From Swiss-Prot:
The keyword Hydrolase does not apply. It comes from Zea mays (Maize). One of its GO terms (cellular component) is HIR complex. It is found in: Nucleus. Residues 920-940 form a coiled coil. This is Protein HIRA. Residues 453-490 are annotated as: Disordered. More abundant in apices and young leaf primordia than in fully expanded leaf tissues. Belongs to the WD repeat HIR1 family. WD repeats lie at residues 10-50, 64-103, 123-162, 165-204, 259-331, 335-376, 644-685. Residues 479-490 have a biased composition (Basic and acidic residues). Keywords: Chromatin regulator, Coiled coil, Nucleus, Repeat, Repressor, Transcription, Transcription regulation, WD repeat. Pfam families: Beta-prop_CAF1B_HIR1, Hira.
Length: 964
């Protein structure tokens, strides 16, 4: 035996958590606390350290993780290297042509080999601590501290299943060598056996670990190469710690490996099976087999094959056992100063590598006379075939129809983050934009109004859609979450939050002007806006925008408080205006303009600017009795250098809005003045009872206004009718349903029209509400109620969508909140989150976002094999049987008023091109898939046989039919 402890195998003095040898025996990999994966040369281990060049030892350093690397595992074919980390991410590495690179500023030479990440898998909500490849390398199982095991498909990179059943941290996972089962071990002191055919629980073993003491970093169990035994970790048989062995079939502990003085952390079976050595007169080739010359038909006890297993413990000891002996073959003490955490056998079966938390690794090389003769691969395959039959077809479910294979190909082309193009032709009308008012003393609204007649201006424009600027397509800076573990270690997890935004909170289409998060926290309650103060000096000068409507507000937010029942005011609302006060040293801006592009193609059209400027009058300038000064505001409409019209109103102007049809001016005194396009007062001043806080208008005749008392109005100014009069009081949580700090308080930071024409209100908590005109209530379309969802911060929406921008803002706000419990059921939250997003996109009438949410929801249900919900989705898109559409009885909810379209998209087309291919990603639901494929085909066939209207009863026998 040769024992070696190379000093050059290290991770910058930090712990080494995992070690694994490549199948070909050319390389081995380590993962450590320095957040790196290092690939080393096996050839350098057995060479003289003094003569070996250090450049040949370390082949590559992989720096793609943001947390400690807990596990590294080579695929059976040796091409891929998988790594799992504290950053909750699994990376798949592959070697590429050429040489590698070096870390900037490290001073190290470039890597000898070029290894790149080809797949990044996210889905776990806690540390990934163990990995295991399937026998054919098509699937990878990962165990995590979120109590789950995820199954990943290497063909498409999709998580095909999530195994839930453990009630505590999963710290070990291993794959059956013939691919029929997966075994996992957890801190809940159980071992679970899972079927790979349908990912159901085959058996739950408990009782053998109930007396175990202490805790370990890992519980890395192992499956024997003969497929008959599973050796587990962290057992206890008084007075020693043990490694219980489970036997296949009954899954009961038949015996234990005893002797360690501390909990066992890792066990590792040798990849080969051995047979005892023979003397010269007992040559196995010369030994007779069968009945020839009176030899025994069955091999003798000495000829029986056996397994070799290595065990690592917290007592810093490694033992090597054979199943042919009751005592350990080898015991290694005093090699490490801390716990042994991982083991790996070489492909030839005679070298054992071990790593420890002390940051070192050791190699133990055995001789043939110590372990025995290794059985060849053909002998092992023959032995498995005789015992378990042909195992070649056990790796995956078989496709039951050719259509399943075709849909699987279509499903593989669909990626979870693909950019979905719109099915419907979007409207050409330009979007609305908003801008802030840096100087409350001067409010300017600039529009470019085409020359249209009064009759043309009465017509309602079509739907609008935001144009996303190129500047918004840049990747956002990396943000991070930070918290401390119970042991005191600090954990920092970077997060991608989507596209960068010009603002740090609400998108520019749904906010009056940019609001800084820091300023929101430093606002002065009860401070009324005054002339001459500056709220944002960065907005000086003229802002170029693309819009046909515009608005400008002075007030940044509205604080609404619901008074307690004992206050004697019957629960009326108490309102405060809050505004950010800029330092006095900053120079106030003189104006803010919103320029509008003429969509009719008139390049010579000049912008029209509506300006509100305060006018101070002293007592000497007044006519009449009294010495008090009064404040007035001068309203001017300017086109180029020409003043089109002007007017003066008393008081301070707080909000402005306008489009090609009208202008609206709201004042602090609580009245609203509406002007025609030419400056005529369209109606007397409208008294609102309190100051106007938020204002918005569409591109026709609708005007939205929110007052300081939390009342919302929507008018159709052309018909002189009020469409909506409602209060924001329903958005205020009751004092007994919220925290003591924010009981009965809500801060409104935005109120605007959504693209569907309904009012959209955003709160400082980043919750967004849409008012449904049919339901007569508010719908919460964006919130932070799903922190553990897999899509909480990584959902990919089509660019420019309202829901996507709100979701990005929610992700930024959630990054500031404490992390959720690691035992949260992320699967339940993910499903609820997707269902909520699907309903919200439908309420917003956003076709692109609805289709994207639908695809993600169906993929998730297919991964979970949730047939009941998948059936409900398919039935809703398939509709009632042919011939019953429109003639269903009122008592049949399935056939009642079924609409073949949703948001302008054909339901059958969505079912055929999107839903069914997404379901094909999991063969466990292929029977349900085939059922609806047949129903859809039958439906389409029936449609082609229905006579066209007016062609029946011709009597000539040549009735025409409608073709699809």
């Amino acid at each position: 035996m040769i024992l070696e402890k190379p000093s050059w195998i290290r991770h910058e003095g930090l712990q080494i958590f995992s070690i694994d040898i490549q199948t070909g025996g050319l390389r081995f990999a380590t993962g450590g606390g320095d957040q790196k994966v290092r690939i080393w040369s096996m050839e350098s281990v057995h060479k003289d350290n003094t003569n070996n060049d250090s450049k040949q030892r370390l082949l590559a350093t992989l720096r793609d993780h943001f947390g400690s690397v807990n596990c590294v595992r080579w695929a059976k074919h040796g091409r891929y290297l998988a790594s799992g980390s504290d950053d909750q991410v699994i990376l798949i590495h592959e070697r590429k042509a050429g040489s590698g690179t070096s870390e900037f500023g490290s001073g190290e030479p470039p890597d000898a080999e070029n290894w790149k990440v080809i797949m990044t898998w996210r889905g776990h909500t806690a540390d990934v601590v163990d990995l295991s490849w399937s026998p054919d390398d098509s699937t990878l199982a990962s165990g995590s501290l979120d109590n789950t095991i995820h199954i990943w498909n290497m063909n498409n990179g999709i998580c095909t299943a999530v195994l839930r059943g453990h009630t505590s941290l999963v710290k070990g996972v291993t794959w059956d060598p013939i691919g029929s089962f997966i075994a996992s071990q957890s801190d809940d002191k159980t071992v679970m056996i899972w079927r790979t055919s349908d990912w159901s629980l085959a058996h739950k073993t408990e009782g053998h670990w109930t007396k175990s003491l202490g805790s370990t970093f890992f519980r890395r169990l192992a499956w024997s190469p003969c497929c008959h035994f599973i050796t587990t970790t962290h057992g206890f048989q008084k007075p020693r710690h043990s490694a219980p062995v489970l036997e296949r079939g009954e899954w009961a502990a038949t015996f234990d490996f005893l002797g360690h003085n501390a909990p066992i952390v890792v066990v590792k079976f040798n990849n080969s099976t051995f047979r005892k050595n023979f003397s010269s007169d007992q040559d196995p080739k010369a030994a007779p087999v069968g009945w020839a010359n009176g030899a025994s038909k069955t091999p003798t006890k000495e000829q029986q094959p056996y397994n070799v297993i290595a065990i690592g413990s917290q007592d810093r000891t490694i033992t090597v056992w054979t199943t042919a002996s009751a005592r350990p073959l080898f015991v290694a003490r005093h090699f490490f100063s801390q716990s042994v955490v991982d083991l790996s056998w070489s492909p030839d079966g005679y070298s054992l590598f071990a790593c420890s938390l002390d940051g070192s690794a050791a190699n133990f090389h055995f001789e043939v006379k110590e372990l025995g003769h290794r059985l060849s691969d053909s002998e092992m395959d023959e032995w498995k075939r005789n015992r378990y039959g042909d195992v070649g077809g056990r790796q995956s479910n078989l496709a039951e129809s050719p259509a399943q294979l075709l849909l699987e190909q279509a499903s593989a082309k669909q990626s979870a983050g693909e950019k979905v193009t719109s099915i419907v032709e979007q409207g050409k009308a330009p979007p609305k934009v908003s801008a802030g008012v840096p100087n409350p003393g001067l409010v300017v609204l600039s529009l470019e109004v085409p020359e249209v007649s009064h009759e043309d201006s009465k017509k309602t424009a079509g739907p609008t859609a935001d144009d996303v600027k190129k500047g918004n397509q840049l990747s956002s800076p990396v943000k991070q979450r930070e918290y401390r573990r119970p042991d005191g270690r600090k954990r920092i997890i970077p997060e991608a939050v989507g596209f960068a935004s010009n603002q740090d909170n609400i998108p520019n289409h749904s906010q009056n002007h940019p609001v800084n998060f820091s300023s929101l926290d430093q606002r002065m309650n009860g401070t009324k806006p005054s002339y001459g103060s500056n709220s944002n000096s960065n907005n000086c000068g003229v802002k170029d925008r693309t819009s046909v409507t515009a608005r400008a507000n002075i007030t940044e937010s509205l604080v609404i408080q619901k008074a307690s029942a004992g206050a004697g005011n019957d629960g009326r609302l108490s309102i405060e205006h809050t505004r950010s006060m800029a330092p006095s040293s900053l120079t106030p801006c003189s104006a803010l303009s919103i320029h509008v592009i003429n969509k009719n193609g008139n390049e010579d059209a000049l912008p029209v600017c509506l300006e509100a400027r305060p006018v101070e009058r002293g007592a000497g300038d007044m006519i009449g009795v009294g010495a008090l000064s009064t404040k007035e505001t001068e309203i001017k409409c300017i086109k180029g250098t020409k003043t089109l019209w002007s007017d003066r109103i008393s008081g301070k102007v707080t909000v402005l809005a306008g489009n090609a049809n009208f202008w609206a001016v709201g004042c602090e005194d609580g009245f609203l003045q509406v002007y025609t396009r030419c400056g005529v007062r369209a109606m007397p001043a409208m008294m609102m009872g309190s100051a106007a806080v938020f204002i918005d208008c569409d591109d026709s005749w609708k005007l939205l206004l929110v007052t300081g008392r939390g009342l919302m109005y929507i008018w159709n100014l052309y018909d002189r009718a009020c469409i909506l009069h409602d209060s924001l009081a329903s958005l205020v949580a009751s004092p007994d349903e919220s925290s003591a700090k924010d009981a009965g308080t809500v801060k409104v930071i935005s109120a605007t029209f959504s693209r569907c024409g309904s009012p959209l209100v955003a709160l400082a908590s980043r919750h967004a509400f849409l008012y449904d005109m049919s339901l007569k209530c508010w719908l919460r379309i964006a919130d932070d109620c799903f922190p553990a969802s897999n899509f909480a911060s990584s959902f990919s929406f089509p660019q420019g969508g309202e829901l996507g921008k709100l979701q990005i803002d929610i992700g930024k706000f959630m990054a500031r909140k404490p992390i959720w419990s690691r035992v949260t059921d992320d699967g339940l939250q993910t499903r609820a989150h997707l269902e909520n997003q699907l309903a919200s996109s439908l309420a917003l009438k956003s076709a692109q976002e609805y289709r994207q949410c639908l695809l993600s929801y169906v993929r998730f249900l297919a991964r979970e094999a949730d047939e009941s919900r998948l059936r409900e989705v398919c039935e809703s898109f398939l509709g009632p049987p042919m011939g019953k559409v429109g003639s269903a009885s009122p008592t049949d909810p399935k056939n009642l008023a079924w609409d073949p379209d949703v948001l302008g998209m054909k339901k059958h087309k969505l079912l055929k091109e999107d839903i069914l291919p997404s379901m094909a990603s999991n063969r466990k639901v292929q029977r349900l898939l085939n059922e609806f494929m047949d129903l859809l085909l039958e439906y389409e066939t029936d449609v082609t046989l229905i006579p066209q209207p007016g062609t029946e009863g011709n009597g000539n026998g040549n009735d025409k039919v409608m073709t699809s």
